[in-house]
């Protein structure tokens, strides 16, 4: 008679049935049975240097594939280290399944070494958090974890596996993945949306991350081009319409009011496509009571006093947009928007023409753009550089600029770039971070070397938490406090981890240095001193722009 598999072995069978081909994590004493079950499977397990890195890797894997990325930790401190990355996936809408080891069920009611109630701990930052307490339920728990992670607005889920349950024989088998069927919007809502758009005087499309997740880039672009409607994207929707499309008015979401706010000041109808309040609050784009909002998404709107749609078109986003195109009609060009775009293009070109060093942010991004192909991937960390990326890094396809902007966690870029390069080895992948963010997960460069995943990291060095310094200077008359620090020699640090290390000393060195770094078969780190005096200059300039509207 064939010996029955353990719960840990069946759990791994379930992961394989879900199509899992890679996992990220750190083994621990309470996950030993699971680790050996993974060893005997077809799944590639990548040991990382910090569980937060594992969670960010799973997060970006999920963003780019639409399938849940999987991360694993042991109990206690291993699980708490996962929390930041799991929370990031939850708020940013990235499908992720976190698996944690746990003490045996016989120890849970006692004061116990490293024991925390992980199911309760993960509940506020996941769509579903469940513990396997009976071996025969493993199939259902795994299937539901993936279903909830991937359906609707994606997000994180959590499975907790006690040590003694992992060892028990399990009379269970994997459940089959169900075919996900498209949900189509109510035709009366389609017609109502088409009527509002047709009758609008100055409509604006606001495209959010949901449009990217819904693979709606072609539909958004066609809607804009055929109905002559300008498009503003959130940070996480960069590339939803090519930046060189004449109706692209680029990105909204930096703390200051920008040129695009003038567009919203004049609009009567906002067509919100895949828009998520958690990423960019309505106050940032100037939602008003006299605006009419059309909400188009795969999920109903999260309403608040500033965001109350007149009509909600809930269903497959692309299909909804094509249906709206069949009933909406508009003629005439949005002259103000087109003129505003010309102003923005001229301003960006002028700001990128500076040859000084430390380099200006706009010049760095212009040079990066020249080296990167249209479908190459930039992964942004969080800091002042993120604001400049949002404003000055042109994108032409979705998922070519990955930004954490729901949870907005520092330390995202290096593990995120690792996952992107793992998935797309043929593409250039750049992690762009500040010196603060770099030090939060730089240890994963060793993981990249060991696993032979050669992406490039570009560090903007200013020896401070630049975004907070910028906000302090804005609010306290140019003064700042508690944001400055010293750095190690990043070039030598990179080389100590067997990466290639570079330092840029002149503006004209950046492009050839990037080109050389991308030719390497090992990870590379480039350090570029950045002139963040540009931050306050930009703030002053934007105040003048908004005063002239």
Regions found by a protein language model. Give the residues of each.
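N-terminal alpha/beta PP-like core and its mobile active-site loop of ThDP/TPP-dependent enzymes
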Residues: 1-328, 367, 371-377, 454-457, ...
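Phosphate/pyrophosphate-binding active-site segments
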Residues: 2, 195, 289-386, 493, ...
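Active-site diphosphate/adenylate-binding microenvironment
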Residues: 11, 16, 31-35, 342-420, ...
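A generic structural signal for residues located within well-ordered alpha-helices
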Residues: 30, 53, 215, 359-360, ...
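Charged, low-complexity, helix-prone segments enriched in Lys/Glu/Asp/Gln
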Residues: 61, 336-354, 420, 456-458, ...
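Thiamine diphosphate
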Residues: 99, 107-114, 303-306, 312-314, ...
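Short, surface-exposed loop/turn motifs that are enriched in glycine and acidic residues
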Residues: 183, 354, 358, 480-483
């Amino acid at each position: 008679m064939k010996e029955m598999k353990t719960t840990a072995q069946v759990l791994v069978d379930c992961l394989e049935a879900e199509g899992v081909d890679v996992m990220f994590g750190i083994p621990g004493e309470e996950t030993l049975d699971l680790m050996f079950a993974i060893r005997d499977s077809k799944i590639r397990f990548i040991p990382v240097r910090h569980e937060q890195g594992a969670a960010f890797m799973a997060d970006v894997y999920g963003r780019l594939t639409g399938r849940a990325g999987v991360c694993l930790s042991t109990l206690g401190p291993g699980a708490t280290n996962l929390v930041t990355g799991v929370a990031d996936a939850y708020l940013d809408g990235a499908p992720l399944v976190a698996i944690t080891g746990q003490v045996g069920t016989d120890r849970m009611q006692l004061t116990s070494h490293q024991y925390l109630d992980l199911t309760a701990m993960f509940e506020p930052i996941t769509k579903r958090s469940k513990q396997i307490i009976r071996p025969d339920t493993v199939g259902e728990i795994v299937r539901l974890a993936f279903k909830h992670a991937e359906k609707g607005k994606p997000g994180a889920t959590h499975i907790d596996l006690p040590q003694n349950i992992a060892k028990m024989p399990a009379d269970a088998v994997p459940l089959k993945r169900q075919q996900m069927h498209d949900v189509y919007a109510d035709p009366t809502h389609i017609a109502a949306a088409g009527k509002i758009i047709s009758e609008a005087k100055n409509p604006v499309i606001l495209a959010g991350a949901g449009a990217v997740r819904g693979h709606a880039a072609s539909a958004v672009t066609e809607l804009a081009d055929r109905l002559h409607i300008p498009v503003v994207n959130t940070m996480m929707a960069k590339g939803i319409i090519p930046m060189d499309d004449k109706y692209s008015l680029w990105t909204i979401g930096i703390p200051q009011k920008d040129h695009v706010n003038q567009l919203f000041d004049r609009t009567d109808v906002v067509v919100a496509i895949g828009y998520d309040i958690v990423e960019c609050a309505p106050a940032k784009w100037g939602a008003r009571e006299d605006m009419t909002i059309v909400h188009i998404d795969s999920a109903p709107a999260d309403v608040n006093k500033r965001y109350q749609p007149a009509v909600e078109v809930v269903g497959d986003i692309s299909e909804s947009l094509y249906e709206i195109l069949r009933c909406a009609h508009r003629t005439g060009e949005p002259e103000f928007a087109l003129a505003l775009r010309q102003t923005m293009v001229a301003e960006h070109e002028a700001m990128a023409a500076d040859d000084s060093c430390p380099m200006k942010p706009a010049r760095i991004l212009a040079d990066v753009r020249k080296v990167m192909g249209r479908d190459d991937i930039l992964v942004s960390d969080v800091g002042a550089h993120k604001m400049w990326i949002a404003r000055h890094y042109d994108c032409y396809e979705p998922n070519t600029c990955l930004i954490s902007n729901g949870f907005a966690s520092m330390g995202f870029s290096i593990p995120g770039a690792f996952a992107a390069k793992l998935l797309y080895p043929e593409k250039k992948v750049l992690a762009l971070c500040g010196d603060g963010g770099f030090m939060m997960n730089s240890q994963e460069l060793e993981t990249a070397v060991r696993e032979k995943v050669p992406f490039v990291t570009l560090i903007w060095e200013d020896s401070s938490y630049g975004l907070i310094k910028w906000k302090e200077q804005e609010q306290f008359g140019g003064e700042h406090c508690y944001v400055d620090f010293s750095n190690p020699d990043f070039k030598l640090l990179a080389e100590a981890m067997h990466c290639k290390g570079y330092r840029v000393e002149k503006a004209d060195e950046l492009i050839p240095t990037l080109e050389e770094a991308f030719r390497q078969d090992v990870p590379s780190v480039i350090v570029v001193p950045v002139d963040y005096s540009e931050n306050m200059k930009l703030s002053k300039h934007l105040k003048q722009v908004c005063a002239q509207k």
